[in-house]
Amino acid sequence: MKRRKPILSLIFLLILCVVLQSAAFADGSLLSNADFSLPELPDGWDTVAYEAENYSVYTQNGALVIASAAENDVRVCQMVQVEPNTVYRLSAEISAEGVHGGRGVCLSVDNYTLDGAYAVSAGRTGSFDWTRETLIVRTGAKQSYINFALRLGSYSETSAGTARFRAAELVQTNDPEEIASAVSLDEPAQPAVKTVNESDEARAIRLRSYLHLFIICTIVLACVLLWGFYRNRERFYSLSADPKTVKRCFILLVLTGAALRLVLTLLFGGHDYDITCWQAWGRDIVQNGASQFYTAPGHEWYDYPPGYMLVLAAVTWLLDLFRIPSGSAAAVFAYMLPAYAADVGIAILLMRFARKRGFSESACLYLGGLAVFNPAAVILSGAWGQIDSILTLLLLLGFSELFEGRRISAGAIYGLAIMTKWQALIYGPVLAAEYLLSIRKKEDALRTAGGVAAALLVIFAVSLPFRGDQGFFWIVGRFFNSAGGYDYASVEAYNFLALCGGNWKSAELSLAPGIPYKAFGMVMIVLAVVLSVAMQVVSRRREGGETLRARPERLLIPAAFCMFMIFTFGHYMHERYVFPVMALLAFAYAATRDNRLLVSSMLLSVVLALNETTAMYVVSNAASAAVRGTQQHQIVTGVCSLFEVLTFFYTAKVCLERGFGQKDRR
C-alpha cells in the first residue's frame, strides 16, 4: 500500500494537470494566461509602445486596461505557435472611454519583426460598453508563429484614451464565411529580421549594429559620388558633345538611375509606415471614393493634402488593371516611380536652365547626372518612397514660370505644390515678396492678383472631390490640424534643436531657462523670413532695372536660404523638409557659376542622405523599439546635427554675401 501512495499521488497530479489544461483551453483558444483576473500582467504577455511615456497597462476586474494620455500605439502581445496555411479567428471583448484619433481599440497580428506580415481589425473609437471585436486571418505557407496583439492605436494611426480587453481568444475556424473573408498573412512587407529564439537583448544589439553599418555606407557612398562629380566637373565641362549625343547619354543615365532605385526597392521595400499608407490610401479612394477619405471614422489623422492622394489612387487603379498584387515588389516600385519621375523632371529642368545660362552641352549633362544620382534623391525615391522630389519639381516649375514673367501660371503651379505637400507654404513669403517687389505698373498688379487667384482656384479644384459634407473651407482646418500633428522640437531632423537635445522632445519643453523650443523656433522662423525678404530688396535695388529672367538668383538664393534657416533653427521639422534646398542651390550655381553654391548643394546632399538613412531606419517598425533613444542614436543625432549646422553656416555665408554684398562671383 505504501508503494501505491506515490503512484496514486502521481496519477492524481497528472489528472489535475490535464483538467487544468483542458479548462484553460476549453474553448479551443491557443492563447495562454488570457484571464486577466490577477493584479499583474500574466506571463507570456509583453507590452510594446511607440511612445515610451504617458501610458499605462494594468489589469482591473478581469480585464486588461491600456490607457494613454497622448496619442500612441500601445500593444500587449503574445507569441503563439500556429499551423501554416490555416484560418484563425482572433477575438476579444472590448470597451472604451474617450478613445480618439487613429485606429482606436483593435486587435492585430504584428509579425513585422518576424516575417513582415501584418493585419489589424477595423478598430473603434469613442466611448462604448463591452462588444466583441474580431479579426480573421489565414497564416502563410511557411508561418509557424504569429504575434497576437491587443492594441490601442496602430502603425501611423496612433490613438489616445482608455481601452479594455477581456475574454481574448485565438481559435482555428472552419466556418466557410470566415474562411472566405480571412486576411492573408502570406505577403510579407519586409524580409525576416528576427528569429523566434533570438533574445530581445541580442536583437537590440544586432539592430544597433545595422544602424552603424547604414551610417558608414551612406557617408562613404555619398562622399565618393559627390567628390567624383565635383573633382571632375571641369573635365566634363571641357568635353565637346552635340545635343544628340547628350540626349542619348541622358537616357542612359535615366535608365541606370531607375535600375539603381529598383535594386534599393528590392533591398529595403520602402519605408514600412509610408508605403503601407500609400497602398492603404490609394486602395481606400479606389474602393470608396474620395468624398469620405478625410471624414470616415479613424481617418482624422490623415495629414497629407489631397493632391498626391489622386496620384496614389491612379497608381492603385493601374495595379488593379494589370492585376499586380498589393504588397509585391512590383507594386512597391510602382508607388516609388512618381518620385523618380520627379527626379528626372528636376534634372531636365536644370539642364534646360543651365543651357540658357550659357553652359556647354557636356556641362548640362553633368548637372543632369548630378540631379539623377543625388544621394539624398536616390535614397528617397529608391529606398524610402517619399515624395519630396515631387514638391521640389513643382516649386521649380513655378519659379521657372516666374522667371519668364508668367505670374498667373506660376501661381497655379504653386497652388498645386501646396496641395501636394503643406511644406510648400514655407516658400510663400519669398514668393509673395517677389510678386510685390516686381509691381511697376497696373498690369503687373493685375497679373499678381491673377496669380493669387489661380493658386486659390487650383487649391479649391483639387480639394473639391474630397470635401464630402464638409464646408467649402475644410482644407484650411485640415492644414492647421496637420501643422500641430507632430508637437516635437525635431522629428528626426538633424538640426540645431536636435543638437541641443530636442529630437522627439515636446516643443513645449525648454531649450534654455524660460525659452521653450517652440518660442525659439518661432523667433528664428520670423528672422529667416525677414533676412530673406531683405536680401530680395537689397539685391533688387543693387541690380537696378534688371529683370528676374536676367537675375534668377535674386529669387533662388533667398528661397534656399529661408528654407535652410527654418529647417536648421525651426521647430516641428522633419528630416526631409530641407530637400528642395539642394535643387535651389544647384539652380543658383547654374545662374551665377559660383562654385561655393555647388559645394553647398553637395554638402547638403551628404547631410540629408545621412539623415534620411538613419531616420528611415530609426522610425521603422523593426528597429524603433531597439534603437530609438539609445546612446548610439543620441551620438549619431549629435554628430549629424553638428554637420548640418556647420553646413548651414557655410551656405548662409555664401547666400548673405551674394544677397547683401557681391553682385558677381564666378
Feature names for model-found ranges:
Residues 27, 187-219, 227, 249, ...:
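Transmembrane helical bundles and short interhelical boundary loops of multi-pass, membrane-embedded
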Residues 276-303, 307, 317-324, 469-478:
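Extracytosolic helix-loop segments that constitute the early lumenal/periplasmic catalytic or substrate-binding loops
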Residues 348-352, 390-407, 584-585:
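Specific aromatic-rich, kink-prone transmembrane helix
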Residues 356-361, 396-409, 439, 545, ...:
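Membrane-interface transmembrane helices that cradle and orient dolichyl/undecaprenyl
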